C-alpha cells in the first residue's frame, strides 16, 4: 500500500470556496489510484484554505503525470463554483509534484490537471500526456469559438453577453463591483445635475468642468489652464493618449501646400521652412484615415468629422508647436490653411477640429483596434491553441486576464447599435465600422513593434518624447524576460518550427486578427527563436504598456471637453472669417453629449480594484527555477525603470506617468 500526501489550495476570494464533494485520482507512469474523496474534519474548501489529505493506492504509481479532480454534489447543498489555486502531491519517496489550476471549476464535472513542468509538444513523450494535450485543445476549441462581429475587422470571441461568458473570463467580484458601481454613480450624478437632459450648447467654457467638480488632478487642472496654448497642443502629440501618430516630415505632401510666407512669422527670421525640413525639426500629423468616413445625427442634428493635416515644428527649446492646419485632404479655395497668426478663436477652432479628429482616430484605431480587439485575438488564440502545460501559455495567460470580458462589455454598451457611439459620437456605429476597416488595412507589424515604429516614423531624436523614452525601456525589459523564457524551451530554430501548437497559435492570430493580410508584415509562421522573442514581446507590450499609454490619460486630458470633442456640430470653416466664442460653443458638443462621453471615460479609467501591475505574477504557472529567476530579474528591471521615471518627473511641470510600471496593468482589462 502506497500513501500519497495531497495538498489542495483554494483561492482567496470571498466566493472561492465550495461545499461540493471533491475527489481526486492520481495518474502515474505505472498506473492510477482509485478515486478518493478529499474529506477531513471541518470545512474543507473554504476561501484561502490550504488542506492536506492522504490518498491511498494499492501500488506505487511511479512519477505522477496528471491528476483528476472530481466535483460532485454534497448532501442537499446546491452546486457552488470553486476556485482552485493548485494541488501538490508528495509521493511515498518524498518527491513533490505540482499541478497548477488557477481557475474556477463550475458545475459537476471532472477536471484533469497536468504536472506543472512546462513542455513544448516534443517534450511530452508519454502517450498519456500527448493524449491529454490533444483532448484539452479539443475541449478549448469547442469552448472558445470565433465570430465575425464587423466584416473586415478582427474576429472576436463568440460571446453575446458578459453574464453568459465562461466564468473564468469574467471580472472578479471586486473589479465588477467597482466598475459598475462607478458607472452608476457617475450617470446618477450627471442626471441629478441635469446635464444628461440638456441637448443645448454650453453657455460658457467655465461651465464645462462642473460636470465633474469633485475630480481634480494636476493634469486636469493643467488642461483647463493651458488647453488653448500651442505648446500644449503640440505636447499632446508626444505625451498625450495618442502618441503614435506624429512622424518626421522631410518633404511637404503635395496636398498640403504650406509656403515659407505662411510660416515665416512662426519660424522667425533666423531660419526657413526648407532649412527646418532639412534639419529634421518639422513633423506631420495626418488624419487621412478619416477621409470620407460617414457621420450621423446626434440630438437631431447632423454631425461632422474632418480629415486634417497638421504641420508641427520642434523649437530649439524642445517645445513642439503647430505651424499650419488644413482641415481636409483636398487643398483649394474652400479648404484654407489656418495659421497661428489668424484671429484667436479661428485658430482655436482649427486646433479644436484637429483635436476632434484625434478623438476619432485615437478611440477607434489606436485604442479600440490596436489595444482591445488585438488583445482579444491574442487571448482567444491562446485559449484555443496552447494547452496549459505549454510554456507560452504560462507566459501569456497573465497578459490576457479580463481582456475578453471588457470587450464583450464594449460590444454591449459602447459600439453596439444604439450604444454610446450612436448617441454621442459623430461617426456613430456606421462610421466606426468603416474606420476600423481602414485602420486594420493600414496596420503593420512595424507599427506594433515599438523600436521599429519609432524608427519608421522618424521620431528617434524628438526631444521630450517621454512615451518613446519610457516605452523603449519597457519594451527592452519585456524582450529580455521573453528571450530568457524562449531560450529555456527552444534551443534550436527547428524546435520553434516543429512546435505545431505554437505555429497554430501564430497562424490563427494572422487569419483571425489580421485577416490573412500579408501586406501587414505580420508573420503567419515563426522560424527562429529571435522571431519568436520579438513576436511575444509585441503581444505582451500591446496588452500591457501600449494599452496603458492610450487608455490611462483619456479622462484627465478630456475632462475639459474642448480639448477632446467627440463630435462637431457644424462643418469645418471654409474661409477665414472671424469666429466668436458663441460660434465656437455652438460647434463643439452639447451638454448632454459632453456629459455622456465624460461619464464613459470616467468609468474606463484605470481600475484600482484587483489590478495587477506589469510583471506581477501571483499565480505560479511556472514552477521551475529558471523562469522564476527571469521573473525576478524582470521585476527588478521594472523597479529600476520606475525609479528613473520618478526622478525625471520631479523636474517636469506636467508629469508623464502613463508608462510608469506600477500604473501599467498586465493585461487589457479596462
Task: Please give the residue ranges for each predicted region.
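Long, compositionally biased charged/polar stretches
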Residues: 1-670
